[in-house]
């Protein structure tokens, strides 16, 4: 909102800068324009700043000694200077960056800096736009040491922190895949912290090796994207039936199949919830921002270790590659991680599937623990004894026990928080990496007199305990997500009778806040 000022969001999008030197007759003819005014022909309504950037750069650098090709490469810096004027930004940071980048080519650095200033001065001297903007820099909400971090690195750090908190070694079995590979790269740098990384021959081996590491007593993780989850599903199910702690990180990308490897979507939600054979319950957590990836990864590990279950952590390409200022955490402020280890006094009457009566969690006997030799596997087991069983009643009981264990996790996760007006006419609902866009849309609408509220889900399965109570308070609910309505359908199944509208886009791109505002405003008017 500080960027938008009093003019509002739409006004920011009414400026386009173009190099008028690029619109020569032959160029327009090649582009099949019928007139010499392509903007009018296309019906562009924004204010177009037509600036002869190429010719002005040539004139400015004619005595620089650079060849024509090198001079024209400076055009972007002229445009950047004009943008800095438009947004009332100092050129100091850009000048510093250019001097550092071209330290070995000072003549290139100085040429770029010269046209950078030319662009700024052009805007100031010609009053190139009818209005300018000011971006106010806010101080951090809390004091501390901050660094810039992206989602993949934050995920890696969250995994390391959880392993340290639990007193375990961290094992990553992975296979490179866009856009998740950077987690593997980052973790591989930290052997000194007890991290073991194995780049396996394929996705299946990556997950299967992690299941083995979980049985051996490590905090086990595998990282991938949607296509990789398809291949890992059988090994993931081995962790389900074996009731082993495993974290599966899915950095979602555009699909299906190879799809759009470098683009972002939220299309793997139902895959995370149900994309395995049999009744295969698995907790699902969705990170909401680059910095939240640390907390989400930490909590995924905590749930996996304390409840002896595989956990899916969903991020996406937008969150994974996006960056933000991150306050370095104090691990003393994070909750303890206490795996349900067997104790020596249990040895005399212990069985492999013996459970804690309160949580339904089976106890963890890592190999080498004296008196607790046992076996597990992918075949159905007899309740408690762990022997292979095909008895109908036993299978029915085991299916319900595994489901109840995951359902019980709702007692250990935060309740759903609602932001905005208590008497809102519309509740905006989102999940995962769309948090920032939806929050901005709500804030803008409230600033303009609309009564709206916002609830964003990080915990998907199980849902927070107060989910039904929250959602049933509102007459109108809109679920916005980057798929065709997967979470909306999931909510309808879990909380029947809701009046849910949907805002769905599957473009491989983040939401445009203006489009969200327009759609939500229209819903309010219906």
Model segments located where?
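Single conserved hydrophobic/aromatic residue that forms the stacking wall/gate
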Residues: 2-9, 13
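Short internal beta-strands
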Residues: 15-22, 172, 249-250, 455, ...
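Short gly/pro/ser/thr-enriched loop/turn and capping motifs at secondary-structure boundaries
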Residues: 23-27, 56, 204-207, 228-231, ...
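Acidic, Ser/Thr-rich peripheral helices and adjacent loops at domain boundaries
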Residues: 30-42, 265-273, 330-344
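Aromatic-enriched
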Residues: 31-151
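Thiamine diphosphate
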Residues: 96-275, 280-282, 286-287, 506, ...
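Flexible, low-complexity linker and terminal segments
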Residues: 149-158, 166, 296, 301-526
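Active-site/ligand-binding-proximal alpha/beta "capping" segment
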Residues: 279-302
């Amino acid at each position: 909102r500080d960027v938008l000022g009093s003019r509002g969001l739409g006004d920011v999008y009414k400026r386009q800068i173009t190099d008028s030197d690029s619109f020569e007759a032959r160029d327009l003819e090649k582009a099949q324009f019928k007139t010499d005014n392509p903007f009018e022909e296309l019906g562009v309504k924004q204010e177009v700043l037509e600036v002869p950037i190429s010719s002005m750069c040539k004139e400015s650098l004619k005595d620089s000694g650079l060849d024509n090709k090198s001079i024209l490469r400076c055009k972007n810096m002229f445009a950047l200077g004009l943008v800095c004027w438009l947004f009332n930004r100092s050129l100091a940071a850009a000048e510093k960056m250019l001097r550092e980048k071209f330290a070995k080519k000072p003549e290139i650095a100085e040429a770029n800096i010269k046209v950078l200033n030319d662009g700024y001065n052009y805007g100031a001297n010609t009053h190139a736009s009818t209005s300018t903007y000011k971006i106010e820099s806010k101080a951090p909400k809390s004091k501390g040491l901050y660094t810039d971090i992206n989602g993949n690195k934050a995920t890696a750090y969250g995994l390391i922190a959880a392993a340290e908190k639990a007193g375990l070694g961290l094992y990553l079995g992975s296979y490179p895949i866009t856009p998740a590979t950077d987690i593997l790269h980052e973790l591989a740098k930290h052997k000194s912290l007890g991290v073991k990384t194995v780049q396996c021959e394929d996705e299946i081996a990556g997950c299967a090796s992690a299941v083995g590491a979980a049985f051996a007593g490590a905090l086990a993780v595998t990282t991938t994207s949607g296509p990789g989850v398809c291949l890992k599903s059988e090994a993931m199910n081995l962790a389900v039936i074996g009731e082993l702690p495993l974290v599966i990180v899915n950095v979602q990308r555009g699909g299906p199949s190879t799809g759009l490897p470098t683009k972002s979507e939220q299309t793997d939600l139902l895959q995370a919830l149900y994309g395995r054979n049999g009744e295969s319950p698995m907790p699902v957590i969705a990170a909401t921002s680059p910095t939240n990836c640390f907390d989400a990864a930490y909590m995924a590990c905590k749930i996996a270790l304390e409840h002896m279950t595989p956990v899916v952590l969903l991020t996406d390409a937008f969150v994974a590659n996006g960056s933000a200022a991150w306050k370095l955490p104090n691990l003393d402020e994070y909750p303890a991680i206490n795996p349900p280890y067997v104790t020596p006094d249990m040895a005399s009457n212990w069985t492999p599937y013996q459970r804690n009566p309160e949580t339904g969690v089976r106890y963890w006997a890592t190999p080498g623990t004296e008196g607790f030799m046992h076996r597990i596997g992918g075949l159905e087991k007899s309740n408690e004894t762990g022997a292979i069983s095909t008895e109908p009643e036993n299978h029915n009981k085991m299916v319900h026990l595994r489901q109840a264990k995951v359902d019980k996790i709702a007692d250990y996760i935060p309740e759903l928080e609602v932001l905005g007006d208590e008497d809102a006419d519309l509740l905006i609902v989102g999940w995962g990496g769309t948090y920032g866009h939806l929050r901005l849309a709500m804030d803008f609408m409230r600033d303009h007199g609309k009564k709206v509220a916002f609830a964003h889900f990080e915990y998907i399965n199980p849902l927070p305990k107060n989910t039904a109570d929250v959602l049933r308070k509102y007459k109108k609910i809109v679920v916005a997500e980057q798929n065709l309505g997967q979470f909306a359908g999931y909510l309808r199944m879990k909380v029947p009778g809701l009046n849910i509208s949907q805002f769905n886009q599957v473009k491989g791109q983040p939401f445009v806040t203006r489009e969200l505002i327009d759609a939500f405003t229209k819903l309010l008017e219906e």
